Regions:
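Interfacial aromatic "cap" segments that immediately flank transmembrane helices
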Residues: 2-29, 68-92, 138-190, 219-231
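Membrane-helix interfacial "entry" motifs
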Residues: 15, 62-78, 114-118, 122, ...
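Selective recognition of hydrophobic, aromatic-rich stretches within alpha-helical transmembrane segments
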Residues: 32-59, 115-156, 188-231
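Short alpha-helical linear motifs
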Residues: 95-103, 182-187, 199-203, 231
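Short, small/hydrophobic-residue-rich motifs at membrane-helix boundaries and re-entrant hairpins
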Residues: 18-28, 39-62, 73-74, 78-134
Length: 231
C-alpha cells in the first residue's frame, strides 16, 4: 500500500486548490444546518464526490479528482446511500446506548445493589459498543468500494461477502483505517492552528478543508486495497 501517494495525490492535480476549496465551502455551509437535516444533503454530496474519487482511482485515472459540475445530484444520492448503509451497520451500537442510559440511571438510585448492577451494565455496554464501532470501521472500506462500483445500496448489506473480503484483506484494512484516523487527526490539528493564525475566522474554511482532504486520503487508501484484492 502506497500511503505516501494517498497523502500527495490531491496536490498533484492541476486544479487541486479549486476542487478542495469547493468541497470545503460545501462542508462549511452544510455543517451548521445538520441539526435541521438540510445540512446532510451537502455532506452527502461531499461523500458521493469522495466515492467517485475512489472509483476513479480504481480505474487507474492519473488525476482522480473530478470537476465540480454536472453530477451533484448523482453524488448526493450516492452519498446518502453510504450514510444509510453506515447508519444501518451502526444500529447495534446505537441501540446499546439505550442500555447505557438505563445503567446510568440505576447507578444514581439509593439501592446499592441496583447501583452495582447499573455500573456493571455501563461497563459491559461500553465494551460491546467499542467492539461494534471497531467492526463498523473495519467494514467501511468494503462498503465504500461496493457502493462506488455498483451504486447499489443493497451491496452494502451482503454481510457474508463483506465479511469474507474484509477477513481476506484484514492487514491492509487495519492499516487503512488507522492511517485514515491519523490523517483526520493531523489534518484537523493543522486546520485548527491555521485557523488560529487567521484570527479564528479562518476556522470556517480551514477545518472543513482539513476534513475534506482527510476524507480524500481515506478513499484513496480504500481504492488501493480494492485494486489489489478486487471488490
Amino acid at each position: 500500500m502506497d500511503i505516501g501517494k494517498s497523502f500527495s495525490y490531491v496536490f498533484q492535480d492541476r486544479d487541486w486548490l479549486k476542487k478542495v476549496l469547493i468541497g470545503s465551502l460545501i462542508l462549511a455551509v452544510s455543517l451548521p444546518f445538520t441539526a435541521v437535516l438540510v445540512g446532510f444533503l451537502g455532506l452527502a454530496i461531499v461523500s458521493g464526490y469522495a466515492l467517485e474519487v475512489l472509483r476513479n482511482v480504481r480505474q487507474g485515472n492519473t488525476h482522480p479528482l473530478p470537476e465540480w459540475r454536472d453530477k451533484w445530484s448523482e453524488w448526493m444520492i450516492l452519498g446518502l446511500k453510504l450514510w444509510l448503509a453506515l447508519l444501518v451497520w451502526s444500529l447495534p451500537a446505537l441501540l446499546l446506548s439505550v442500555f447505557n442510559g438505563l445503567g446510568n440511571q440505576m447507578m444514581w438510585t439509593d439501592s446499592d445493589l441496583l447501583g452495582l448492577f447499573g455500573g456493571l451494565m455501563v461497563a459491559v455496554v461500553a465494551c460491546l459498543s467499542l467492539l461494534w464501532w471497531i467492526i463498523v470501521a473495519l467494514v467501511t472500506p468494503a462498503i465504500s468500494i461496493r457502493l462506488a462500483e455498483t451504486g447499489d445500496v443493497g451491496s452494502a448489506f451482503k454481510v457474508d461477502s463483506i465479511y469474507v473480503w474484509t477477513k481476506r484483506n484484514i492487514g491492509e484494512v487495519i492499516i487503512a483505517v488507522l492511517v485514515s484516523v491519523a490523517a483526520m487527526i493531523i489534518a484537523v490539528t493543522i486546520g485548527t492552528f491555521a485557523g488560529i493564525l487567521l484570527c479564528l475566522i479562518g476556522w470556517v474554511i480551514t477545518i472543513p478543508a482539513a476534513t475534506f482532504i482527510a476524507n480524500l486520503i481515506s478513499v484513496h487508501l480504500y481504492a488501493q486495497i480494492g485494486l489489489r484484492a478486487g471488490a
